[in-house]
Amino acid sequence: DILAAFRVTPQPGVPPEEAGXAVAAESSTGTWXTVWTDGLTSLDRYKGRCYKIEPIAGEENQYIAYVAYPLDLFEEGSVTNMFTSIVGNVFGFKALXALRLEDLRIPVAYVKTFQGPXHGIQVERDKLNKYGRPLLGCTIKPKLGLSAKNYGRAVYECLRGGLDFTKDDENVNSQPFMRWRDRFLFCAEAIYKAQAETGEIKGHYLSATAGTCEEMMKRAIFARELGVPIVMHDYLTGGFTANTSLAHYCRDNGLLLHIHRAMHAVIDRQKNHGXXFRVLXKALRMSGGDHIHSGTVVGKLEGERDITLGFVDLLRDDFIEKDRSRGIYFTQDWVSLPGVLPVASGGIHVXHMPALTEIFGDDSVLQFGGGTLGHPWGNRPGAVANRVALEACVQARNEGRDLASEGNEIIREATKWSPELAAACEVWKEIKFEFQAMDTL
C-alpha cells in the first residue's frame, strides 16, 4: 500500500475518527451517498483505510491520521495520478478546518514503475569529472531585464572565475527583452569559452520551462543540439506531466536536469494546511530531476535544520529510516532509483560556506546569486571568492578540522592569500536574515 500521514484539524464537534475516515474515503472510493454501482465492484479491495490516529503534542485539536491506499488505485509511473487521487479533492472538505499531507511512504513495487532522475548523483559527477566537494552555482542577476549578450557575458565571467554552473532565474523563460534562442546561443558561447580557458567542464541551467509541452521540448532539443550539459525546469508551475516527459527526454539524450521549485511555498509554507515539502521532494524524485532547491538553513529562505536535512536525505539516499525528530513519518526504500542533488540557494555568501559544507556535505550544489554578483570588484572576483572559500573549507574538513566551530577562522586564514575573498568578507560581514522558520515540527 501507499501510506499517507495527514495532519488533520477537524471542525468543532467533529470527532477525529470521523475526520480521518472522511479523508480516507474521499481520497479513494467514497462519495457522500451509497450508490447502487457499489455492488458491481469489491469496495473492500479498493477503499482507503485510516488505520491510526494520534494527537499532536502541544497542538489543540490537531491529529496525525495515517491512511493506507491499495496500490491498484494508482496508474503506474504517474505522479500526476498519485496526487490527483491522494490530495485532489479532499482538501476542500467541509468537516475539516485544515488538512496537511505530512509524508508519503511509496512502496517498492510502485517506485519501480518510475524512471526517476534523468541521471543521478554518480553519473553527474562522472559527466562533469568533479569529485570530493560540493558543486558551486550562481543565479544570474538582475533576474529580468538583461539583453542576451550581456547575460552571456555575466555567465562567462562567473564560470571563468571558478564556478561549476550558472543558472537562469526561474522567472526567465522567453520575454521581449531576451528571447530564449538568443539566450541559449550566448550562454553556450560563454560555456565553451570558459571551458577552454579553465580546462574544467562548465554548465548553465538553460530554462526549458514554457507555456506548452511542445515548446518546452523544442527548447530542450535545441539545448542538446548546442551540446550543453544541463537544462532546467520549474516543476510545480510546469506540472508533473511535463516534468516527467522532460526527464525521460533528458535521460535518453544525456542532458542533466536542474529543477526549480517555484510556487512551492504556496503549497508547503503553512504548518497546518497544504502538503509538506518532503512530499513534493519525493514526488520530484519519482518524476525526475537531477538537482532540486531544498532550502539553505542559513540564508534568506525558509528551512529549519532538522526538517531540511530530513528531506535532503530523502532526496539523496537509497534507504531512509523513520525519524519523527526530522519529520520523517515512514521508512522509505528507493531501491535503485537514482538520487537527487539538493541545491542550497537564497541569501547565502562566503561567510556561510563552512556551515553549508558541514550541513550539506559533498553531494550538494551551493548556489550564490547576489553572493557572487554583489562582489565589489565584479562577477569574476565574486566567483573566485566563492571557489577559494569552498576549497579552503573542504581542505580543512579533510584535515580533520571542525567546520562548525572553526569556520570563521578557516575563512579568515584563506583571505590572507585571496584578496577577492577578503573583499567579499568585508562586504557581507554584517548581512543576516534572522527570522524564525514557519514550518517547524
Swiss-Prot record:
Known function: RuBisCO catalyzes two reactions: the carboxylation of D-ribulose 1,5-bisphosphate, the primary event in carbon dioxide fixation, as well as the oxidative fragmentation of the pentose substrate in the photorespiration process. Both reactions occur simultaneously and in competition at the same active site.
NCBIfam families: PRK04208.1 (NF003252)
CDD domains: RuBisCO_large_I
UniProt KW Chloroplast keyword: yes
Required co-factors: Mg(2+)
PANTHER family documented for this protein: RIBULOSE BISPHOSPHATE CARBOXYLASE, RIBULOSE BISPHOSPHATE CARBOXYLASE LARGE CHAIN
GO biological process: photorespiration; reductive pentose-phosphate cycle
Protein name: Ribulose bisphosphate carboxylase large chain
HAMAP family: RuBisCO_L_type1 (MF_01338)
Keyword Oxidoreductase applies: yes
Alphabetical keyword list: Calvin cycle, Carbon dioxide fixation, Chloroplast, Disulfide bond, Lyase, Magnesium, Metal-binding, Monooxygenase, Oxidoreductase, Photorespiration, Photosynthesis, Plastid
